[in-house]
Amino acid sequence: MRGDLTFGQSDFNSVDALILSQIVYNNMEGLVPKEFNQKITLAELAERFISTEDFEERCNMGAMINPLTPELLRLAAKSRRFSNVKVCAFINKIDEKALEQFCALTYQIEKDRYVIAFRGTDDTIVGWYEDFNLGYMPEIPAQKDTREYIAGAMAALKGHFILTGHSKGGNLSVFGGMSVPKKSLARLDAVYNFDGPGFFAPVYERPEYKQIKDRIFAFFPEFCVVGMMFEHVNQYKIVKCSADGILQHDPFSWNLMGPEFEAAQGFDEASKIFYSSFNAWANTMTDEERKKFIDSFFSVIYASGAKTNYEIDQNKIICGGKMLAKLAELSEDERKAFKKAIKVFIKVVKDEIPMFTVFKPLVITHH
């Protein structure tokens, strides 16, 4: 991947799309104009970011996001390829009551070409809660935000659009593509999904999906967990990674060959098992049962008093104790359902996601 080539010399590619998806994980609060018609360059953004009084705090990416993410912003901003890219319309909403975590940024890569990047699940528990709500809600709050954001962008900016996102951001990118009205579809060039969760099968039968499916470019790591949640049908590429297990969800571990990703032969056995067990488990429940389960599951997580995975990780014993006490208050059926779900996840997440690993002793069977 060469940072010295402009988009005129080497066209926008999937690696660019992933870089812009990752940059949006940075805390840009108060640094980027909120409007579509006011823009600053990526170089200016990096300068502002580095000069903030709370720079160190902004660089704490929590337990789930690679700590090199601020460095990626700095290096991209220094490169010939990205330094003159303009940014605008940064929005970051976290609403505990509405169970909503939504963040997006628009990049202007050339005169009439824009890339909208959607942030994936961050370190917040509310972000994970909303992810799970994909399991029964026809539309989660972040998807509604996505539709409104894209409509605003297309009304305010002339030209063509590319949508991109990693993790839940990939799901939002595909959802966003489906939300583009027919009259504006000619302005939608591509939709990128990097290891984002899918949808329930009926979504893929909708005309809104069918009319954009050829513009969707999906990429998943060999050991895929997040992307294995719910169904996937479109063509996708599997990427070779330098990390092991669930850590392959982190794009910094994805191998490159020039301007492309290095292809892997297929999915790892463990993630195939997760795909079949997670989706079999999800498909045996009605929407009502799924909602009930998810609410009781997160009532246990929230009992920890933590707002982020990082906080659980830093206070494992205290948080774990509170969560186990809450679990004991659930009915026997709820406890059984809880353990069954945790079992499905623990197999694949091992020690990497604090809100699950606290429960490891519950599900590890001693022979």
Feature locations, PLM:
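Gly/Ala-rich beta-loop-alpha elbow adjacent to hydrolase catalytic centers
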Residues: T164-G169, S173
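Short glycine-enriched nucleophile-adjacent loop
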Residues: S173-K182
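Alpha/beta hydrolase fold serine-hydrolase catalytic domain that processes acyl esters and thioesters
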Residues: M1-Y114, F118-H160, P181-H367
